[in-house]
Swiss-Prot record:
Cu(2+) 3 binds at residues 77-79. SUPFAM superfamilies: Prion-like. It is a lipid-anchor; GPI-anchor. The gene is PRNP. The lineage of its organism: Eukaryota, Metazoa, Chordata, Craniata, Vertebrata. This is Major prion protein. It comes from Macaca fascicularis. GO terms for molecular function: amyloid-beta binding; aspartic-type endopeptidase inhibitor activity; copper ion binding; cupric ion binding; cuprous ion binding; glycosaminoglycan binding; identical protein binding; microtubule binding.
C-alpha cells in the first residue's frame, strides 16, 4: 500500500508541476496588450478606433454603432439592445433593471422516492432499516403439496426485509435471526390489519423465504461495510494524505 501511494505521489507531482508551469507562462497578444486588432489603425498602444467628431464608429452625431442619435446598437432613441425607448437589454425600463431570475426547479416525487428506496430508516422501529425489494427465492420444501402451495402464494410473503447495520452484530447468525423475527412480525401485523390471516403453512414458508432474503441482505451490507472501511484506510495513509495536500496546494495556488 505504501509503495502504491508513493508511485501515485510521484506521478501526480510530475503531472501537476507541468500544468502549473503552463499556467504561469505569459500569453502572447491578447486584449489591450498594445497590438492592433484592426487593419489601418495607429501604432501599438494608440487609439483603436478612427477619430470621429464625437460620434461612434462612422457616426456624425454621437450615436452608437450605426445610429444617428445616441441610440444603442440598432436603436434610434437611446434604447438598450433591441429596445426602442431607453430600456435595458430586453426591458422597457431604466438601466438598473435586473435579469429575470429563473424559478428553482421543483424536486420531483420520483427523485424523492428513489432517494428513500434503499436503506431507509423506518420510524418507530428502533433504528431498523428497510432493504431494497428482492425477487422471492425459489425454494423446495420436500413435497409436492408445499412446493405447489408456495408457488401459488409466494406473492403474499415479504419481498423486503428489516435489518440493523451489520456492525451492531457479532456474526451473521445474530443478524439473520433478528432480521427474520422483525420482518415476519411487521409483515404479519400489516397483513392482519388488512383482514388477511396466515396459516401454519404460511408461517413455515415465510420463515424459509425471509431467512434466505436476510442472508442475501447480510452479504450485501457486509460487502458495503468492508468497502467503506478499505476506503478509509487508503485515504488515511501518510502518502495519500501528502498527495491530497499537494494537489490542494496546486489548485489553490
Amino acid at each position: 500500500m505504501a509503495n502504491l501511494g508513493c508511485w501515485m505521489l510521484v506521478l501526480f507531482v510530475a503531472t501537476w508541476s507541468d500544468l502549473g508551469l503552463c499556467k504561469k507562462r505569459p500569453k502572447p497578444g491578447g486584449w489591450n496588450t498594445g497590438g492592433s486588432r484592426y487593419p489601418g489603425q495607429g501604432s501599438p498602444g494608440g487609439n483603436r478606433y478612427p477619430p470621429q467628431g464625437g460620434g461612434g464608429w462612422g457616426q456624425p452625431h454621437g450615436g452608437g454603432w450605426g445610429q444617428p442619435h445616441g441610440g444603442g446598437w440598432g436603436q434610434p432613441h437611446g434604447g438598450g439592445w433591441g429596445q426602442p425607448h431607453g430600456g435595458g437589454w430586453g426591458q422597457g425600463g431604466g438601466t438598473h433593471n435586473q435579469w429575470h431570475k429563473p424559478s428553482k426547479p421543483k424536486t420531483s416525487m420520483k427523485h424523492m422516492a428513489g432517494a428513500a428506496a434503499a436503506g431507509a430508516v423506518v420510524g418507530g422501529l428502533g433504528g431498523y432499516m428497510l432493504g431494497s425489494a428482492m425477487s422471492r427465492p425459489l425454494i423446495h420444501f420436500g413435497n409436492d403439496y408445499e412446493d405447489r402451495y408456495y408457488r401459488e402464494n409466494m406473492y403474499r410473503y415479504p419481498n423486503q426485509v428489516y435489518y440493523r447495520p451489520v456492525d451492531q452484530y457479532s456474526n451473521q447468525n445474530n443478524f439473520v435471526h433478528d432480521c427474520v423475527n422483525i420482518t415476519i412480525k411487521q409483515h404479519t401485523v400489516t397483513t392482519t390489519t388488512k383482514g388477511e390471516n396466515f396459516t401454519e403453512t404460511d408461517v413455515k414458508m415465510m420463515e424459509r423465504v425471509v431467512e434466505q432474503m436476510c442472508i442475501t441482505q447480510y452479504e450485501k451490507e457486509s460487502q458495503a461495510y468492508y468497502q467503506r472501511g478499505s476506503s478509509m484506510v487508503l485515504f488515511s495513509s501518510p502518502p495519500v494524505i501528502l498527495l491530497i495536500s499537494f494537489l490542494i496546494f496546486l489548485i489553490v495556488g
